[in-house]
Each structure stands twice: as C-alpha cells, then as structure tokens.
C-alpha cells in the first residue's frame, strides 16, 4: 500500500512552517508523496533538503485541481479525509485497515489548511476525526498514520540516508556520512 497526502489550501507566509511540518510528518510516518494545491518554493526546498540528508524517495508535487486528482485516485484507491467532524478514529480505524488490506488499494489522505470544501467530504470513502477538540492537522496526521501502520514506521531507516539516528537511553547516537 502506498500512502499519499493531499494538502488542501496553503496560505503562503502564514502556513509555510506548518505545511513543512505536514510534509515532514508525512514522510517520517510512511507516506510516499505529498501533494499541494499551491506552489511554495520554501516548503518544497525544505522537504527536498530533508530527503537529501535523511534519505528515502519522498515526492513533493503540486496539482492544479485537487478534485481531479482525488477523483482519479479514488478510481483505484481509498480516500480518507481527516476532519474534526468525521467518524471517531477509535471506532473506524480497524475497518479502514481491513478495507486497505482486503482490496490492496493505495491510500490518499486529505487534510486541510483552511475551510475544506463540502465536495471533499462527499468524495472521501471515510471522513475521520482524530478527537473532537481543536488541534493541529499535524497532530491528526501523525496519529492517523501511526495507527494505520501500527507503529511500524516510527523507526524507519531510509536508503541513501546521509544522516541516521539510533535510539539510545543515554546519549546521542548520530551517524553522518562525510562527502
């Protein structure tokens, strides 16, 4: 199963840091690609620097029409929309995992930066809430991806990494490849 993240909306200066965190969280927790609906050179370059240093094959893409992208994806994949107004993650997560496992389909995860159009709710196979209190989309994304993968991606190591951290009880264990 491949996981892609579709970030709806991005408000330039206001969102560049949080959008970067959305991309880095996506990469760190198992997604293969993040798709933005707005061009942002700063976010793209930040993500590319991380991938260059920490490895992997994470992709950054910009699409003109999120609707077209999501509709095409849904033809052969499963679309989950993270929203405060969706079904309780504790009640629906097993069903989502089983659906993916049974169908062997890829997953598109929609998260918003601003008010999400009604069409996203209608298009999604699942509208899922991670709690019913206001919090960050980064938190919702991290919790969902961790639950989806059952913690298996937390300590992933990536091919071609120039920097690697090894968990340790008492010291920093960092490997840095010299050029």
Swiss-Prot record:
Transmembrane segments: none annotated. The keyword Transferase applies. One of its GO terms (biological process) is tRNA nucleoside ribose methylation. GO terms for cellular component: cytoplasm. SUPFAM superfamilies: alpha/beta knot. GO terms for molecular function: tRNA (cytidine(56)-2'-O)-methyltransferase activity. It comes from the Archaea. S-adenosyl-L-methionine binds at residues 82, 112-116, 130-137. Its EC number is 2.1.1.206. InterPro entries: Alpha/beta_knot_MTases, tRNA_m1G_MTases_N, tRNA_mtfrase_aTrm56. The keyword tRNA processing applies. It holds the Pfam family Trm56. Keywords: Cytoplasm, Methyltransferase, S-adenosyl-L-methionine, Transferase, tRNA processing. Homodimer. Belongs to the aTrm56 family. Specifically catalyzes the AdoMet-dependent 2'-O-ribose methylation of cytidine at position 56 in tRNAs. This is tRNA (cytidine(56)-2'-O)-methyltransferase. It comes from Methanococcus maripaludis (strain C5 / ATCC BAA-1333).
């Amino acid at each position: 199963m491949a996981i892609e993240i579709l970030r709806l909306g991005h408000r330039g200066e206001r969102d560049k840091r949080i959008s970067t965190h959305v991309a880095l969280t996506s990469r760190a927790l198992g997604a293969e690609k993040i798709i933005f609906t707005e061009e942002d050179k700063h976010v793209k370059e930040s993500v590319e620097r991380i991938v260059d240093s920490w490895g992997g094959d994470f992709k950054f893409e910009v699409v003109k029409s999120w609707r077209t992208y999501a509709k095409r994806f849904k033809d052969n994949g499963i679309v989950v929309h993270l929203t405060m107004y969706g079904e309780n993650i504790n009640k629906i997560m097993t069903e989502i995992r089983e659906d993916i496992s049974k169908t062997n389909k890829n997953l598109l995860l929609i998260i918003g930066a601003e008010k999400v159009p009604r069409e996203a709710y209608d298009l999604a196979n699942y509208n899922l809430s991670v709690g019913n209190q206001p919090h960050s989309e980064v938190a919702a994304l991290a919790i969902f991806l961790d639950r989806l993968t059952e913690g298996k991606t937390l300590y992933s190591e990536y091919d071609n990494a120039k920097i690697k951290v090894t968990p340790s009880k008492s010291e920093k264990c960092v490997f840095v490849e010299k050029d």
